[in-house]
């Protein structure tokens, strides 16, 4: 059940296309079926980093069974993808990783 949550201080023209591409890419990177991937994109113009409102992204990737020993590789792949799609330089793109225990992810009336 991967969740990719993206907060950006610059808007994206075709959000639906971007969200769909992001879903496919996260499934590919994590080797999971896209059926359970969730992607949330939020435009928030009230977002600065290092006293600058230049384009920036804050990203959360949460997943059951996230291979924490591979977060460096996963980070590189996600940053390459997001930077190419949004134009945000990688030094202004941040990812927070969370490996969610199955008993802490509710779904379909229970937990995973």
Please place each PLM-identified region on the residue numbering:
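Interaction-mediating elements
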Residues: 1-112
């Amino acid at each position: 059940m991967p969740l990719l949550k993206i907060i950006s201080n610059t808007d994206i023209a075709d959000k639906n296309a971007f969200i769909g591409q992001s879903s496919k890419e996260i499934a590919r990177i994590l080797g999971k079926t896209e059926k359970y991937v969730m992607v949330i994109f939020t435009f928030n113009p009230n977002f600065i980093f290092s006293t600058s409102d230049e384009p920036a992204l804050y990203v959360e990737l949460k997943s059951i069974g996230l291979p924490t020993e591979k977060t460096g590789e996963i980070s590189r792949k996600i940053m390459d993808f997001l930077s190419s799609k949004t134009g945000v330089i990688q030094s202004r793109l941040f990812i927070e990783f969370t490996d969610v225990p199955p008993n802490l992810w509710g779904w379909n009336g229970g937990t995973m």
